[in-house]
Design a protein with these regions (language model features):
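Structured, non-membrane catalytic/scaffold regions adjacent to prosthetic-group chemistry
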Residues: 45-252
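N-terminal secretory signal peptides
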Residues: 1-22, 36
Length: 252
């Protein structure tokens, strides 16, 4: 017993390979029988590749259903300041001690199907009208917490740079190596913001400084931290976790 208590804490970096192994496909493998998968998808399941193809088909079907049911007019629940979770839990695909500092020359790049590709400095972003929210952050791991953010509505920003609002995807890249993407309808939902502040203070590195996506209508892994580039595109961009089998639409 004492040897267990004296063991050093395991970092996220050490357990990350195991977490990746236990992703969404693993969950589906454990809950759906091969017979059910065959009936649902029509794939031959005698090999691992057949099972993976069947699970991929189910995930794509799930994405299509969620997209069809999504409404930009349906808002995530908001809360009073008294409901804010303190202390707020750090969460990322790496340990907190591995948080990267903001690059000295940081700018937000804008590309793809937009008219104005000029980069944005933090000062330019802060000069835009900001919108606040107190909403629930829901993690795919099964826990949630309530936080307060404020920032630029993503829809207003996309209109300002002349984005093609009929495009299918908005892709986000981060200077910590993370990436994710969302559908255009979700990007234009009024609560989707490019957050600059957390609890009425400029974002600190562990909370995604200097700029993060905050999208309360989706699971937490879609609210990418440490943004450095936004791209509007019709080509499916995937994402860090999405490319490993996680649900792409990830609605809540």
């Amino acid at each position: 017993m004492s040897s267990q208590r004296n063991k050093p804490a395991v970092s996220m970096a050490e357990i990350k390979p195991e977490l990746e192994r236990l992703h969404r496909r693993g969950f589906l493998r454990g809950t759906l029988s091969l017979g059910a998968l065959t009936m649902l998808t029509g794939y031959e399941l005698s090999t691992h590749s057949g099972v993976d193809a069947a699970l991929e088909a189910i995930l794509h079907f799930d994405d299509r259903v969620q997209a069809a049911l999504f409404s930009r007019q349906r808002l995530a629940q908001t809360y009073p300041a008294s409901a804010i979770t303190r202390p707020f839990r750090f969460n990322a695909y790496y340990a907190e001690w591995q948080v990267r500092p903001v690059p000295d020359n940081w700018v937000l790049s804008v590309g793809g199907l937009v008219a104005d590709r000029r980069p944005w400095t933090l000062q330019k972003l802060m000069a835009l009208p900001l919108q606040g929210q107190i909403t629930r952050h829901i993690c795919v791991e099964g826990w949630s917490q309530i936080g307060q953010w404020s920032g630029v509505p993503l829809g207003a920003f996309l209109r300002r740079v002349g984005a093609d609002l009929s495009a299918r995807y908005v892709n986000f890249k981060c200077f910590d190596g993370y990436s994710t993407s969302i559908d255009m309808a979700s990007a234009l939902q009024p609560q989707t913001i490019l957050a600059l502040d957390f609890e009425e203070k400029p974002l600190e590195p562990q909370w995604g400084a200097p700029l993060r996506l905050r999208i309360p209508t989706k699971l937490g892994f879609k609210s990418a931290k440490n943004l450095e580039a936004i791209e509007v595109t019709n080509k499916y961009p995937g994402g860090y976790w999405e490319n490993q089998g996680y649900d792409w639409f990830a609605g809540v």
